[in-house]
């Protein structure tokens, strides 16, 4: 029997690979002859770098970059064996890096571009970048500036890479953009489909969490529209209505405009392709997935259900193991998960349940008992 294990991280507890390896240990305790393959899993957001680096023999790179409020921050990204860089923009320009009240007029994505350039200079030509958790609403002008684009006002002054500059952009130059960027391919993990502007755009929909006041929204959206018009006139092409252009405060728009070989895709689709899950599932019998909490929202989510759909496409039975399970998680059974189980085995505190050693033990023990049952069932056929 071949079993493929692909479990999302249990946030605040086990990483994807820690959960997967504990599960494998339990399966082999029940069925020593089973062929068990563990693959990393993430949705393109928090935990993606750790999952892919741990699960695909990657390494970590560290670089000091400009943080969202202009401060120096120490950013980490991953490099896989095929020289693919895996990044989370939140490492450089995330909302968690802002101390105190967010200021959308001063926040910049400069550090994202600096992190990309660091990887380019180290030989990376393929990129997987998650753009969730941003602190910025400046249309990606910071990232583009770091990559060599120059934005000028009416008096030929180079503008600082912050929101307040957007309405003043009159001319754009790309003379200093490194030629190596044309050799790079970017897969942007983006599950947001909002355009750049209008009441469905980044200012109106996501601005509040980044410090935009209600009375500022109309003005800031108008400024974003003027910036987009200038960029699109320079490029001779429209990007602002493309689904995902409004992601990460307009960083999606900046990728579409500033980089030649880019694609904005669902994060789980990018990760499943990177880990080559379909290849492993072709001759598998069972796939085990899971996450920290399985509930009704999981049925509309992306990670366990994404794995389940891939499993069903390849004729596999699908089992999910979760830290906790709610009554409405039964909806997951209609989305390809044949059976699901909580791993917590008794009354406990949240801190005890999330302790990594306890969580790994619970995962191992639950997986063992589930597969003992599967072993018994096979004898009864």
Task: Describe these PLM feature segments.
Residues 1-131, 135-381:
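N-terminal loops that bind phosphate or other acidic moieties
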